[in-house]
Design a protein with these regions (language model features):
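Polytopic transmembrane helical bundles with strong interfacial aromatic enrichment
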Residues: 1-305
């Protein structure tokens, strides 16, 4: 009974539901199944709820180990990958609901029911791709759990014993989650623009709009997170910026998406170039988050594998 009520159990069930939701979304796309699409959405919501429950229970468990050990569960790769899965899924669910509602309105006011029926499901078309990146994160969580025992709660290293962590890390991962969502929507855009699954994916205009709005939200939160990180660094190390590898790559990520938004808003770019850019941007962001921890050393080395 103790295991069933543990944070590890909730997070493992979250992982299972995300995997099932991914399969259901793809079934909805390939078979055009409304039932599969609705089931996928419900499983995604359930997975998010279990992930949140797991993190809250883990927070409580850390305090049961000792008041000096207790901390908000955003301090290591295991915890932040769970957070990443939740945030990315929530962002997808928001856009799914928003565009499904808009589609329902257009269907209601449209004269032709036959045309509306043939229209691809927005939620399934986007979810099938977004859930792939969540599945990759789930795979990492499972590997990290069983191979490295990462689910074990550890005391915070001195550098993380700060209230700044409670706001810097979540803001960062809203950025990461929305950047990941934009990249996967970019993949869907590229496939549809080349005639692959063209009749089963949402309109290019919808995909382009989701991609743009996701990067806009992500850029705003990533900017806030970077500023908070600089303030935290000033308190912890005596300087706002030290050109640590993590800081340098965070700046590269920020400049990348600043340029993306600039060419869209000022230069009027649309379509495939920005879709490719969003996909490549995720690779840059992934290296900034994981690659730096694996291959480079610096003040942020406490986040290594």
């Amino acid at each position: 009974m103790k295991y069933l009520a543990s944070s590890q159990s909730a997070i493992l069930w979250m992982s299972v539901l995300f995997l099932l939701a991914t399969m259901a979304y793809w079934a909805a796309v390939l078979a055009r199944s409304v039932f599969a699409a609705r089931s996928a959405t419900r499983m995604t919501w359930a997975a998010v709820a279990l992930g949140l429950s797991g993190l809250l229970v883990r927070w409580h468990e850390s305090y049961l180990m000792g008041a000096d050990i207790g901390h908000i569960p955003v301090s290591n790769l295991y915890e932040v990958f769970v957070l990443f899965c939740m945030i990315t899924a929530l962002c997808h669910l928001y856009y799914e609901q928003r565009y499904r509602s808009g589609r329902s309105l257009s269907i209601t006011t449209a004269a032709s029911t036959a045309t509306a029926t043939a229209e691809p499901d927005v939620g399934a078309g986007v979810g099938a791709f977004v859930l792939l990146v969540i599945t990759a994160a789930v795979g990492f969580i499972l590997w990290y759990t069983f191979e490295r025992g990462a689910h074990e709660i550890q005391p915070l290293v001195p550098a993380l014993q700060s209230w700044w962590m409670k706001i810097h890390v979540p803001a960062n991962f809203i950025g990461y989650g929305t950047f990941a969502l934009a990249a996967m929507v970019g993949c869907a855009y590229l496939l549809k623009s080349h005639g692959i699954l063209a009749d089963r994916l949402p309109a290019l205009e919808v995909l382009d709009d989701v991609m743009y709005k996701s990067i806009s939200v992500g850029f705003a939160f990533f900017t806030v997170a970077t500023i908070l990180g600089a303030l935290w660094a000033a308190e912890a190390w005596g300087g706002y910026w030290s050109w640590d590898p993590k800081e340098t790559w965070a700046l590269i990520v920020w400049l990348n998406y600043a340029a993306w938004l600039h060419v869209r808003l000022v230069k009027g770019w649309r379509g495939e170039p920005l879709a490719w850019w969003a996909v490549i941007g995720l690779l840059v962001t992934t290296f900034a988050f994981i690659g730096v921890n694996m291959f480079l050393t610096g003040l942020h080395s406490y986040g290594s594998l």
